Each structure stands twice: as C-alpha cells, then as structure tokens.
Amino acid sequence: MLEHAYRRRFRQGLSVRSFMLARLQRLYPLYALAFILSLPFLLGQLAAGAPDRAQTILGLLCSALMLPTPDPAHLDADLYPFNFAAWSLFFEVAANLLFAALGKRLDTKSVICLVGGFALALVVCATMGWLGFGIEADKRGVLGGGPTWETFGAGVIRVGFSFFAGVLVYRFYETARLPAARPGFAISAFALVTAILALDFPSSLDLALSLFSVIVVFPLAITICARFDPPRGAFANMMQTLGLLSYGIYVLQVVTFHAVEACARHLEVQSALVGLVAIPVVAAVAYAATVFVDVPVRLTMKQALKGLA
C-alpha cells in the first residue's frame, strides 16, 4: 500500500518529515481512541491498588504517546501492556521510517537485498532460537515474537521481512503485468492461507513448514489475490468495507474484547460463545470508529499539521 501511494511522491521530493506526519495522521486517531476507551479499565487497576503504581502510570504516559513502556525489571513484559496489539504498530512505524529514509534510493535491487537479508535472518534466528524466537512458541507459534521485551529482536526481523516483502510483491505486481487471476485461483489461495493459519503442523515439521509458508506461500498467495478483480456488486462492496475496517478492527480488538468480557462477567455468562459474540461487536465498533472518529479526526489533523510538513 505504501509503495503504491508514496513511491512516485518520494521521487518528486517528498520529505521524511512529511511522510511520517502522514503516517501519524493515519495511525494515531484510532490508536488514541483505543487508549481512551481503555482508560476505565486502567484507572480501575490503579484504584484497586495496582501492584506497581509507578510502572502503571509510566505505562499510561508511554501509551498515550504511542511509545512502548520500558520495564527493565520484567523482560517478559509487553511493549504495550494496555493494548497488546500495538506492538506491531511500533515496528511498522520504524519500518516506515527506514522506508522513508531510503526514499527514491530504494530501487528494486535494494528491496531484493533487504528481503533476502531479513529472510535469511528469519531462518537462522528461528532455527537457532536467537533474538527471542521460540520463547513464546506455545502461545504464538514457532515464529512468534515481538510483543515483549525479551522477544524484541524477533519482532524486528518479522516486521522487517514482511514490510519489505510487501514492497517487493507490489513491484512485481506492477512490472510483471500478469493476467487477472480467475476467481478459483484467488479463492484457492485464500483458502490455503486460512488453512495454514488454522491448522497445527506436526511438531517435527512445524518450524520448516512455518518458514516455508511465511517466505514462499504467503507472498505468492498475496500476489495471486492482488490480481483478482472482484465483479462489481455486493462482493466487491464487502471487500472494500473489510479493507476500510481492517486497521480499526486490529487496533480496537483488545479493548473491545475486554469490554465484552466485563459485560459477560457482570451478567454471569460463562460460555465459549462470548468470544463469538465479540467478533461482530469488534467489527461494529471498528465501523463506527472509522466513520465517525477516524475520518473526521484525520482531516482535522491534516489541516493542523499542514505547516509542519
């Protein structure tokens, strides 16, 4: 997406500052909304006597600024203790900064070198258990890592590979001029990715198959699906809506799930269905937040920050 939107603008002289301000306008409004919605839970922790009040207050301040919370006493602490999902946003912003710093100098050969380097680092570090890979394998899979301080290095490699692989996929998509993908191919690619994410690989093959999926299967599947042009109508509208809501769903999922869980406890409901109920609630919250908060706030920020670009 960023490659499509900004490559030509970098060639025309777009500055790093202007690019990063644009990314701030895109990412911060819904992140800030998630933080504000989580405040009742956080203040409740303080009122109830949080075990480490100073650390909780530090977390509040850092979270408000979209920064990770330092916690040298606990290496397994989350970078974003109040919105777990925000860890990848931090790494994405870092990747965005590198992307902007390289700007028009980032030719395709350089992208291939970056993707190859990160892929090699991913294979070696995941195999050897370096930089935090494997520490959270029971919770987040053999390639999990990045949300906590002890797996920070794994996050750098994961996001570095995925970000620049996305840039490379787009450049291939743009220059190869491949024919449009048939619906059957696109559906098969989507089904394959879904199956890989849903199923557990045998433990003896888990690492190898996970690496193959991430480095080979997923980029190919994305390339195929990108070549699929859905027919106009309800299906195309649904795809557009899902794309519109994707960021809101991601950044608001944690606080919304907490709210649904709190309601379930208050109503003394104990059922696995609570999780299923939370899914449409998250989608509805993301839709309302995108339409009524994100879009107008971004327009306001664009006007307010115009002089700084």
Annotate each PLM feature.
Residues 11-16, 56-57, 107-113, 178-184, ...:
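Membrane-helix interface segments
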Residues 123, 155, 163, 190-296:
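Alpha-helical transmembrane segments of multi-pass integral membrane proteins
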Residues 93-130, 170-186:
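Solvent-exposed interhelical
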Residues 20, 28, 90, 111-116, ...:
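Hydrophobic alpha-helical transmembrane segments
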Residues 3-5, 13, 17, 21, ...:
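Membrane-interface helix-loop-helix regions
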